[in-house]
Amino acid sequence: MYHGMNPSNGDGFLEQQQQQQQPQSPQRLLAVILWFQLALCFGPAQLTGGFDDLQVCADPGIPENGFRTPSGGVFFEGSVARFHCQDGFKLKGATKRLCLKHFNGTLGWIPSDNSICVQEDCRIPQIEDAEIHNKTYRHGEKLIITCHEGFKIRYPDLHNMVSLCRDDGTWNNLPICQGCLRPLASSNGYVNISELQTSFPVGTVISYRCFPGFKLDGSAYLECLQNLIWSSSPPRCLALEVCPLPPMVSHGDFVCHPRPCERYNHGTVVEFYCDPGYSLTSDYKYITCQYGEWFPSYQVYCIKSEQTWPSTHETLLTTWKIVAFTATSVLLVLLLVILARMFQTKFKAHFPPRGPPRSSSSDPDFVVVDGVPVMLPSYDEAVSGGLSALGPGYMASVGQGCPLPVDDQSPPAYPGSGDTDTGPGESETCDSVSGSSELLQSLYSPPRCQESTHPASDNPDIIASTAEEVASTSPGIDIADEIPLMEEDP
């Protein structure tokens, strides 16, 4: 793109000179051609004088930030030089100049003033923490920018919130994007910000710390507020009085809080402790550094303990011993229980317990009377032959309380009884029967001889049922055989 300026109405003389010189241009061209031909024929040395007699205009020059056409050569009378500017610049002066003869006969440029190129657009300004929206700005245009988050636009002239592009390519009232300014740092402390950072966006929080031996006076944290000022003034680091070395303790030592303790500054806490086997004389084991002095100010002592506590290793061994003893005891108890159970099982196998009478009639059974085993009849034998062996006289004696059998019957003869009278022999025989019955009752639970107390006038059915009970509840027992065995010698 080329920018130029058309000649104004005041250049009438220039136009008149152009019109006068137009017919002479071919003549001048012919003269130059003729001169070059003569130079070729006779040599340049012989024509030097003639070349010097030729008149030309001086070089008009090339404007800065622009260019000219033609860019070089010899400018004879009637020559024209045209000027142009680069992008972003505009031409100040004539766009073309003519080489003409003045009234005194010399050649010169008309107009005589040199043309220059001046900046046409304002360059994009470099503003930190900002975004420039337009890329080109011409004369009179307004700058449009947006600040980054946390920063706000500020103009030098608070009454004029506009920045315009001047005709000379510069800006007036150029703004900046500003945050909170860099706060001051204490000489005895430091702050967690970069040394190169000069502005901080809204919401930034910075922290202050003091060197050892100094105390922070003020807020340790500062925040950049919406009005672009800090939440409080920067704190100071004040020197503190340092406490001397804590008192030494025999058979003990101390630790400080917080660790490590390079210097015992104000607020440092020291905790005392004793070696193993020793204990403090006082329950209070802390002292605090306050303004260069330890508080409370007392001497700490460690004395030998009367009771020595086992070490961790010994305590661990004791614990394992208890656990092992308990486990061994439990295992032994379980083993004894298992052995007892096995022994009980084997014992039952060799000595089976007495139970109810066997249901099978073929299994033999016996009783021991005075050390002599007596085989008992089976149940079937006792039922079928028991009553027939006793005879009718015995059934009557059972109903009448064991009297002597009747005269027409032949009862079995009892040893030791020679007469058949109903005298003392009767009671002895009944007692013998009673004794045998008691023995049988203890083994097989037969009915007692209380049935003999019933009178003879009772119902015969009761007597018959009693006899059946004796026979049924005493299987395999022969009453006639048992009574002589139980009878004592007179």
Swiss-Prot record:
From the UniProt entry, list the residue stretches annotated as the region Disordered. Answer: 1-21, 401-490
Bias type Polar residues, positions: 430-456
Q: Organism classification, top ranks?
A: Eukaryota, Metazoa, Chordata, Craniata, Vertebrata
Q: Name one Pfam family in it.
A: Sushi
Glycosylation positions? N104, N134, N192
Q: Which residues form the signal peptide?
A: 1-41
Instruction: Write out the function statement from the record.
Output: Acts as a complement inhibitor by disrupting the formation of the classical C3 convertase. Isoform 3 inhibits the classical complement pathway, while membrane-bound isoform 1 inhibits deposition of C3b via both the classical and alternative complement pathways.
**Positions of the Sushi domain:** 55-119, 120-179, 178-239, 241-304
Q: Which Gene3D superfamilies match?
A: Complement Module, domain 1 (2.10.70.10)
List the disulfide bonds in this chain.
C57-C99, C85-C117, C122-C165, C147-C177, C180-C224, C210-C237, C243-C289, C274-C302
Its name, as the record gives it, is Sushi domain-containing protein 4
Taken from the record's topology, the Extracellular segments are 42-319
Q: Which residues lie on this side of the membrane: Cytoplasmic?
A: 341-490
What InterPro entries does this protein map onto? SUSD4 (IPR042985), Sushi/SCR/CCP_sf (IPR035976), Sushi_SCR_CCP_dom (IPR000436)
Any stretches that span the bilayer, and where are they? 320-340
Compositional bias of kind Acidic residues? 479-490
A Gene Ontology biological process term: negative regulation of complement activation, classical pathway
CDD domains under this entry? CCP
Q: Name one GO cellular component term.
A: postsynaptic membrane
Tissues/organs with expression: Isoform 3 is the predominant isoform in all tissues except cortex, cerebellum, kidney, and breast. Isoform 1 is found primarily in the esophagus and the brain.
Keywords carried by this UniProt record? Complement pathway, Disulfide bond, Glycoprotein, Immunity, Innate immunity, Membrane, Repeat, Secreted, Signal, Sushi, Transmembrane, Transmembrane helix
